[in-house]
Swiss-Prot record:
Kinase among keywords: no
Organism: Methanoregula boonei (strain DSM 21154 / JCM 14090 / 6A8)
Pathway stated in the Swiss-Prot or TrEMBL entry: Carbohydrate biosynthesis; D-ribose 5-phosphate biosynthesis
Keyword tRNA-binding (UniProt): no
Annotated protein name in UniProt: Bifunctional enzyme Fae/Hps
InterPro entries: Aldolase_TIM, Fae/Hps, HCHO-activating_enzyme, HCHO-activating_enzyme_sf, HPS/KGPDC, OMPdeCOase_dom, Ribosomal_Su5_D2-typ_SF, RibuloseP-bd_barrel
Binding site for substrate: D19, L48, K66, T68, Q83
Primary role: Catalyzes the condensation of formaldehyde with tetrahydromethanopterin (H(4)MPT) to 5,10-methylenetetrahydromethanopterin. Catalyzes the reversible formation of ribulose-5-phosphate and formaldehyde from 3-hexulose-6-phosphate.
A GO term for molecular function: orotidine-5'-phosphate decarboxylase activity
UniProt record similarity statement: In the N-terminal section; belongs to the formaldehyde-activating enzyme family. In the C-terminal section; belongs to the HPS/KGPDC family. HPS subfamily.
Amino acid sequence: MYLVGEALIGEGAELAHIDLLLGSKEGPVGSAFANAVSQLSMGHTPLLAVVRPNLLTKPATVIIPKVTLKDMEQVNEMFGPVQAAVAKAIADSLEEGAFKDIDIEGIAIIASAFVHPEAKDYNRIYRYNYGATKLALHRALDKFPDEKTLVYEKDRAAHGIMGFKVQRLWDPPYLQVAMDLVDMGKVAQVLKEVPQNDHVIIEAGTPLIKKFGLNVIGEIRKLRPNAFIIADMKILDTGNLEARMAADATADAVVVSGLAPTSTIEKAISEARKVGIYSIIDMLNVQNPAKLIEKLKVKPDIVELHRAIDTEETAHAWGDIPAMKKAAGGKLLVATAGGIRVEVVKDALKAGADILVVGRSITASKDIGHATDEFLDQLNREEIDQFRIMTDF
């Protein structure tokens, strides 16, 4: 058995990223340690962690460069501040009692270290790698993260280097702005004026996709890179193919019509799950949504109770939302759509809605920002992590 730890600390070109393995010298970590020291690789030469020349840290630690070292400047950074930082972090942890009840002569540590080719500041390189090594080591010893922490954090996480956040819908209720538009100028205006908010979803409506194709998702993404974007394709056939097309276009969710054959719906849901996007069933003109959900072998992420624009003057009737959630096994978001106005938001939420789909009340407003804020005020939901102080993650 061996333990695994990881940590990223710092900023700019000098940031440090350490992947760490700790295990018995008699096991796979010990074998990998011996192979690393005895089988050198050009540009990725492993080096033992020493506090200073002739002073090996304990437990014995080998450092593996993650990035090919192409010039002497990078070599000096790896054999200088990185080597010293890793060794000192391990030695300090030993002094602090991190290895209590562990035979330090019986274990080995492998630390993979990242040095950006543009890194220059030795002081920052040292301090960031020291912190990252120490944090990675303690995470390994603590078996961090536990399952509860991982599940809690996974959908609110933003990768430090990726540059954008993949939104997930774990904190309802949400406001979905439906852009059933055919003018890209108007689309740009809406995207510019709708406030940035964790509880806003952007929908590329069916007319918009029919006119401009799925490429419109990419255009929306350019203006709102962190938005949760729905491709309202109302799939009726080739469910798996069209769901994959939506994912390839960078949509976060795809809509399949509840009037489609059951096999088409199931294929769309399965494909959406496979590629990591949400599946939505539009229940427009479906007489018994709960019954449809119940008979599906794979359940959708979201059900949209959608009254068509042509019939939205009729009374607000969203059906038995609790029955639909029960049919889906309890883990289902329900969206209500069609003529949603500010004065009926509370009724929809009380009925069990998780997502309020609003179109013309926002997109046709003379003050799009203010109109959106009115709906958001009704949701009574603060920004995710607004008051959270971020440290390690």
